[in-house]
């Protein structure tokens, strides 16, 4: 669920997700096209691809269960859809954390009209 994803991002990065990631680069937030602008934008590209692979459920609005153990996100539960969605969100949140050093403020509210490179496939 998007609210759970927001909490994961906040825990992993310390950043406010809506301000920092909702409009970042060419892939963070709604939609996505062109070539990812940097490693953080690539996290969003990979997250979009991960969601595309989850079939038979709506990854953005279904709730899942997770916990934090020693700073690590642990996805819990049995239903396939919820577990896989949690794993997609977990990987993206960790990716954001791992790329904090290369986060660029200039991509924070990047207009998608500048995302003109050919779109990569998953």
UniProtKB/Swiss-Prot annotation:
The active site of this protein is located at 47, 89
UniProt keyword Magnesium present = no
Q: Please report any disulfide bonds recorded for this protein chain, giving both cysteine positions.
A: 26-115, 28-44, 43-95, 49-122, 50-88, 57-81, 75-86
Tissues expressing the protein: Expressed by the venom gland.
Gene3D superfamilies the record matches:
Phospholipase A2 domain
Q: Where mainly found?
A: secreted
Write down the Pfam families for this protein, in alphabetical order. Phospholip_A2_1 (PF00068)
Which positions does UniProt annotate for Ca(2+) binding? Answer: 27, 29, 31, 48
Q: Which GO terms describe its molecular function?
A: calcium ion binding; calcium-dependent phospholipase A2 activity; phospholipid binding; toxin activity
Keyword Lipid metabolism attributed: yes
Give the cofactor note.
Binds 1 Ca(2+) ion.
One biological process term in Gene Ontology: lipid catabolic process
Q: Which SMART domains match?
A: PA2c
Q: Per the record, what are the reactions this protein catalyses?
A: a 1,2-diacyl-sn-glycero-3-phosphocholine + H2O = a 1-acyl-sn-glycero-3-phosphocholine + a fatty acid + H(+)
What does the entry list under GO cellular component?
A: extracellular region
Q: What is its EC number?
A: 3.1.1.4
Annotated PANTHER family: PHOSPHOLIPASE A2 FAMILY MEMBER, PHOSPHOLIPASE A2, MEMBRANE ASSOCIATED
Q: Which family does it belong to?
A: Belongs to the phospholipase A2 family. Group II subfamily. D49 sub-subfamily.
Mind telling me what this protein is named? Answer: Basic phospholipase A2 PLA-B
Species for this entry: Protobothrops flavoviridis
């Amino acid at each position: 669920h998007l609210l759970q994803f927001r909490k994961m991002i906040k825990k992993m990065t310390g950043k406010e997700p809506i301000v920092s990631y909702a409009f970042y680069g060419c892939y963070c937030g709604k939609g996505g096209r062109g070539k990812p602008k940097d490693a953080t934008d690539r996290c969003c590209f990979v997250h979009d691809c991960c969601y595309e692979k989850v079939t038979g459920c709506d990854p953005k609005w279904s709730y899942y269960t997770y916990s934090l153990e020693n700073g690590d996100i642990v996805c819990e539960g049995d239903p396939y859809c919820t577990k896989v969605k949690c794993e997609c969100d977990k990987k993206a949140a960790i990716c954001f954390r791992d790329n904090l050093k290369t986060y660029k403020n200039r991509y924070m509210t990047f207009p998608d009209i500048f995302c003109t490179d050919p779109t990569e496939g998953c």
